[in-house]
UniProtKB/Swiss-Prot annotation:
Name listed for the protein in its UniProt record: 17.3 kDa class I heat shock protein
Subcellular location, record wording: Cytoplasm
Lineage of origin: Eukaryota, Viridiplantae, Streptophyta, Embryophyta, Tracheophyta
Gene Ontology terms describing biological process: protein complex oligomerization; protein folding; response to heat; response to hydrogen peroxide; response to salt stress
Family membership: Belongs to the small heat shock protein (HSP20) family.
Domain sHSP intervals: 39-153
Coiled coil ranges: none
Top-level taxon: Eukaryota
Organism: Glycine max (Soybean)
Assembly mode: Forms oligomeric structures.
One Pfam family cited in the UniProt record for this chain: HSP20
Record GO terms (molecular function): unfolded protein binding
Annotated gene: HSP17.3-B
GO cellular component: cytoplasm
PANTHER family cross-referenced by the UniProt entry: HEAT-SHOCK PROTEIN 20 FAMILY MEMBER (PTHR11527)
InterPro entries with a match to the protein in the record: A-crystallin/Hsp20_dom, HSP20-like_chaperone, Small_HSP
């Protein structure tokens, strides 16, 4: 592990993306606990890819270990897509001896401000093999009518 922090966390310049609502943690990659200890959980910091095609905005989130019934999708404030879920800590048996606990638990909340061309009333989602895919169709760009004008003379 490098002692020099990666200030952009390997993300694709989301610091410059006006639609991303991620909270930047400058201490995320340092070898000591962050002040935002909940952000240290791999589950809480679920990575989401967002691509735009000519027809839609497509989000893909890795959410292993959750069933589709445990994931909640909402459109808030008219244009904010919120993906949330929760993975609970496994119940502990007093007779068991744990040697390693690496699987993360906690709450997941990710929000993305959708652009004006998003059809928020037609959002579709599917989940397969721990990957959530959310498709937000786009409004068709209406080209202005072009009218030919005769030139006299």
């Amino acid at each position: 592990m490098s002692l020099i922090p990666s200030f952009f966390g390997g993300r694709r310049s989301s610091v410059f993306d006006p639609f991303s609502l991620d909270v930047w943690d400058p201490f995320k990659d340092f070898p000591f606990p962050s002040s935002l200890s909940a952000e240290n959980s791999a589950f809480v910091s679920t990575r989401v890819d967002w691509k735009e095609t000519p027809e839609a905005h497509v989000f893909k989130a890795d959410i292993p270990g959750l069933k589709k019934e445990e994931v909640k999708l909402e459109i808030q404030d008219g244009r904010v897509l919120q993906i949330s879920g929760e993975r609970n800590v496994e119940k502990e048996d007093k007779n068991d001896t744990w040697h390693r606990v690496e699987r993360s638990s906690g709450k997941l909340v990710r929000r993305f401000r959708l652009p004006e061309n998003a059809k928020v009333d037609q959002v579709k989602a599917s989940m397969e093999n721990g990957v959530l895919t959310v498709t937000v169709p786009k409004e068709e760009i209406k080209k202005p009518d072009v009218k030919a004008i005769d030139i006299s003379g």
